């Protein structure tokens, strides 16, 4: 159950043959996606970030004693469908949908981002976690923890409340997403193995029937 950063902001390709995970950060502008990302990668809270800028970050960590190379795309906050957005929706292996617990509208917009993923991938079975950020601003909270948990149940995904300012829950969110990607890959691999066994059995049955017909001639 461990996760430790081995390198911060690692440029270039993954090293040491680590599995690469393409992660996309989604959420309305101003919810703290960039701050969450920067805290995870460099343990730093940015003083300022332009919410209209999209950027990419890379880091290598260990999760459950397995190396993981994360390629993280921090997107702008507009929940609109564009050609560029379609590309990263299609290429992303896992998604973190963020909202601010101090902004109810950002919570309501979380559903729009979930639908954007569906529009491109045509399935809801995509690794995803829901993150309610800015819990350090408790006095300004507009979205309860229970509401976040309910939405996560609707999404059938893990839910985390975080504070980028205090670096609380940040690692948990990224670890949770990588574990979900691994879980779904493991399930898919199991299904593929079962299908191969069924196909092999079917071929054996057909071969046996063919041999029986030949013996009858």
Swiss-Prot record:
Keyword Magnesium: no
Family indicated by similarity: Belongs to the small GTPase superfamily. Ras family.
Biological function: Binds and exchanges GTP and GDP.
Primary gene name: Rit2
Note: Shows rapid uncatalyzed guanine nucleotide dissociation rates, which are much faster than those of most Ras subfamily members.
Taxonomic superkingdom: Eukaryota
Main location: nucleus
EC number: 3.6.5.2
Catalytic reaction annotation: GTP + H2O = GDP + phosphate + H(+)
A cellular-component GO term for this protein: plasma membrane
Entry annotated with the keyword Hydrolase: yes
Protein name as annotated: GTP-binding protein Rit2
Lineage: Eukaryota, Metazoa, Chordata, Craniata, Vertebrata
Annotated localization: Nucleus; Cell membrane
Gene3D superfamilies the record matches: P-loop containing nucleotide triphosphate hydrolases
PANTHER family on file: RAS, DI-RAS, AND RHEB FAMILY MEMBERS OF SMALL GTPASE SUPERFAMILY
């Amino acid at each position: 159950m461990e996760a430790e950063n081995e390198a911060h902001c690692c440029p270039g390709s993954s090293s040491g043959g680590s599995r690469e995970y393409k992660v996309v950060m989604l959420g309305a502008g101003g919810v703290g996606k960039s701050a969450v990302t920067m805290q995870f990668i460099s343990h730093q809270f940015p003083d300022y970030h332009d919410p209209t800028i999209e950027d990419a970050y890379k880091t290598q960590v260990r999760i459950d004693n397995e190396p993981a190379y994360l390629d993280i795309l921090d997107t702008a906050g507009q929940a609109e469908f564009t050609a560029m957005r379609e590309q990263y929706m299609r290429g992303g292996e896992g998604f973190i949908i963020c909202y601010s617990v101090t902004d109810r509208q950002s919570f309501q917009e979380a559903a729009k981002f979930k639908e954007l993923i569906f529009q491109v991938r045509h399935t809801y079975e995509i690794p995803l976690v829901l993150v309610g950020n800015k819990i350090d601003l408790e006095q300004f909270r507009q979205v309860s923890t229970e509401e976040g948990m309910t939405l996560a149940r609707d999404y059938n995904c893990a839910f985390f409340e975080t504070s980028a300012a205090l670096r609380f829950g940040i690692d948990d969110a990224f670890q949770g997403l990588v574990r979900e990607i691994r879980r779904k890959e493991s399930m898919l691999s199991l299904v593929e193995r079962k299908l191969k066994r069924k196909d092999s059995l079917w071929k054996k049955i057909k071969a046996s029937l063919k041999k029986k017909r030949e013996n009858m001639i």
